[in-house]
A protein has these predicted regions:
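Charged, often Cys/His-bearing segments associated with DNA-binding zinc-finger transcription factors
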Residues: 1-56, 110-115, 350-392
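Short acidic-aromatic active-site loops that bind/stabilize oxyanions
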Residues: 31-35, 59, 257, 261, ...
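Short alpha-helical segments in extracytoplasmic peptidoglycan/chitin-binding modules
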Residues: 38, 69, 83
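Structural recognition of short helix-loop-helix hairpins that underlie histone-fold modules
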Residues: 43-61, 77-78, 276-286
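Short, amphipathic alpha-helical "recognition" segments used to contact nucleic acids or chromatin
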Residues: 64-76
Length: 392
């Protein structure tokens, strides 16, 4: 809330303002259920957007009401017409206010969806304080993966957005840290694009791509090749936790490594999980927004995700998904094994290119296997196996 002293004078703004007042000062649980954040976080969000990102109130609509309208759109998947009816505003007013909030959130996203200063030089407590991973993965700085979001594709290029299931989607490449915050996102790639090609494009062409510093690396799944700065699992070896739950504990060093790698890398799956669960607009199978607007909305929800994580450590959704270590988004292991075989074929066909050293001490990405990282994987596997009782 921006100016508490004006609260008593804000009771003449009609049904919309009365609704917001109830959310801000009534039940905190009701505020959380409707706006997807608690009252304190909502007030902090309004203040930040006003003071740092240029969101302004007007004579008829205060900032809190505009932000609440936007949060109901992305958090509850409400239409503009439903919002206009609930807040007793004209369609034009609602559209204008939603656009203003979206614009402010996109400015915030430019600051929020990147590593913090010193991020790669300090160790996240979640990693250091867990002896399952420390010190074995001491140089790991996060996890990387892609996920698919339904999309209304442009008519001129609709087929490019149809993936294996023939549903139109866009690919979202994201990197998260072990605090379940996004530190990079590239949104809007057609769903047919291969994960490795998306990463290659971003790493070579995007100026703000957070290349891992020398000696550091991200965890990736078998859809990406293991190379300097990107540590993947052993292929054609059990990997996902549910495979070990069904088939018994690891039986060799490679399985020991894969199980621990899968457990640690699940942070990206859980980050995707809480993000999609909180912002219900992302679940829409057939989005009603055009591609450009949809990309902006998806990006805004990722920025909101980070804001909530920083503002409210005990957010119920984050707490729930922190505990779901065995969650992963793929679900179809047979399909995943087929994907791995295709990836290996692509890796063999990929020609190694020299990219120079223009990354200021960071590692340029080349989608080819790397013996040094494979050696690191072997060493970590051997170290993990020393404390693991194998059946031989």
């Amino acid at each position: 809330m921006l100016k508490p002293e004006r609260l008593l004078h804000r009771t003449d703004r009609g049904a919309g303002w009365n609704h917001v007042q109830q959310l801000m000062h009534g039940s905190d649980q009701q505020c959380y259920d409707i706006l997807r954040m608690n009252q304190r976080t909502f007030q902090d969000l309004c203040k930040m957007l006003a003071t740092r990102y240029g969101l302004q109130e007007t004579q008829n609509v205060y900032i809190e009401e505009a932000v609440a309208m936007f949060l109901e759109v992305v958090g509850q998947d409400k239409t503009v017409r439903v919002i206009a009816q609930r807040y007793q505003r004209s369609l034009d007013t609602v559209k204008r206010k939603l656009g203003e909030v979206l614009s402010a959130l996109l400015k915030f996203a430019a600051d929020a969806l990147k590593p913090e200063d010193g991020e790669f030089t300090r160790v996240c407590p979640a990693l250091r304080n867990d002896d399952r991973y420390w010190p074995f993965f001491k140089d790991c700085i996060g996890a990387l993966d892609g996920t698919h979001i339904s999309v209304r594709p442009p008519k001129r290029n609709a087929e490019a957005y149809r993936g294996r299931k023939q549903e139109p989607t866009m690919n979202v490449l994201a990197i998260c840290n072990f605090d379940m915050k996004f530190i990079y996102a590239y949104v809007g790639v057609p769903g047919r694009a291969h994960d490795t090609k998306v990463l290659t494009y971003c790493a070579r062409n995007e100026p703000f791509f957070p290349h891992p510093p020398n000696g550091k690396y991200y965890l990736v799944d078998a859809g990406y090749p293991t190379r300097t700065g990107y540590l993947g699992p052993y292929r054609r070896v059990r990997y996902h936790l549910d495979q070990f739950n069904r088939g018994g504990p690891p039986t060799n060093t490679r399985e020991v490594f894969n199980r621990r790698h899968s457990s640690l890398r699940s942070v990206i799956e859980r980050t995707f999980g809480v993000w999609k669960a909180k912002w219900r607009i992302l679940d829409r199978r057939h989005p009603k927004y055009g591609l450009i607007k949809w990309i902006k909305l998806v990006t805004a929800t990722m920025a909101l995700h980070n804001f909530i994580r920083d503002s409210h450590r005990e957010d119920n959704d984050f707490v729930h998904w922190q505990r779901r270590e065995e969650y992963h988004t793929h679900g179809d292991n047979d399909e995943e094994e087929r994907d791995e075989e295709e990836d290996e074929d692509e890796d063999e066909d990929e020609e190694e290119e020299e990219d120079g050293d223009g990354h200021g001490g960071h590692i340029p990405y080349e989608p080819t296997g790397d013996r040094a990282m494979e050696g690191l994987r072997d060493r970590i596997g051997n170290e993990l196996s020393r404390g693991y009782r194998l059946p031989y």
